[in-house]
Amino acid sequence: MKAIFRKENGLKDSPLISDVLVFEDPIAKENKRLIGLTDGGLIPLPDLETKIEMTRSAVKVFHKLGFEKPKVAYISAVEKVSPKIQSTVDAAEIQKRKENGQLEDINAYLEGPYAIDNVISEYAAKIKGIDSVMAGNADILVMPNIESGNILGKIANYWGNAANGHVITGAKVPVLITSRADDAKTKLNSVALGILVSMK
């Protein structure tokens, strides 16, 4: 990773280097789909502008995966804005900017805040009265901090047995950071994802 951040190497291609995990939805019994998660590996506590850059990077990954207009959900503990929970404030501001045309360069649906059950379970969304394209169907989850992203990724892997792969975005070359506990299949998935994302 140090090689990427050294200016003399000229490897950075974006203002932000971030981690995107892509995994198979472990809940879906049929019609398996991919879900993205950022950032569970590099950015400890992203602020508003950092979350926007993380979004740009994750959306680019999903465009490469064939998603024309991915659905990006900003995750928090609740789906209502609370001044006491900064992630809800950030999420609402990003959605507002998107609706006001300030983020037109990001070809994706951007909405939040959402508790995670709202965007992975249609049943939970229905019970809570959520009427949105995100209801049980988000493609990308932007997590409020590295702890929540890392924990969710490991839960999907170990409890959900979800096939997954990581890729680092923002560099001119494929960059991978794998866990020491990753099996061969996960490492191979990460290599394939890195190659795909780096293709022009």
Predicted features along the sequence, with ranges:
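Anion-binding alpha/beta catalytic cores of soluble intermediary-metabolism enzymes, centered on
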Residues: 1-134, 140-143, 148-200
